[in-house]
Amino acid sequence: CITNYGGRVVSLMVPDKNGELRDVVLGHDLIADYRNIDNNFGALIGRYGNRIDKGKFTLDGVEYDLPKNNFGHCLHGGEKGFHHSVWDMVQISDTLLTLRLNTPDGYAGFPGNVDVQVTYTLTSDNALRIAYRATTDKPTILNLTNHSYFNLSGNPSQDCLLYTSPSPR
């Protein structure tokens, strides 16, 4: 389940080892909680995911001073970050959703008009694929990401520190 408020992944049901569907994405039960609790569960993050030191950056000789929302820094695009935006639905099917957001030059202090499309696809092998596409009309900075948290046990009260994930060396 994905909401167009912040492009958030609200739930992701996957089969466990017994074939029972379990929600493995952490989130809230009420949309109001996504607005009122500042944890970014499942959100699309932008214009710039991460912290911009002191809310300042220089691009092509121009210094930009962004609003600060995190101890004197700009975090995840600030208070007007993409995670606080209502996205337009462009395409929807049983296995695919495309959302779109246009932000004007100067929005949240960032240069350039930016048109972002994000496509969520459920694959036949039970994967969630998130693809980002963005265009702009002038040099800007852009760092898009998704802020989902996963609990692979499917039990939100179970400590996820009990799990290890093998990876190639």
Model-derived segments and spans:
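Beta-strand-rich N-terminal accessory domains
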Residues: 1-33, 37, 41, 49-64, ...
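Hydrophobic residues embedded in beta-strands of well-ordered beta-sheets
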Residues: 10, 97, 127-130
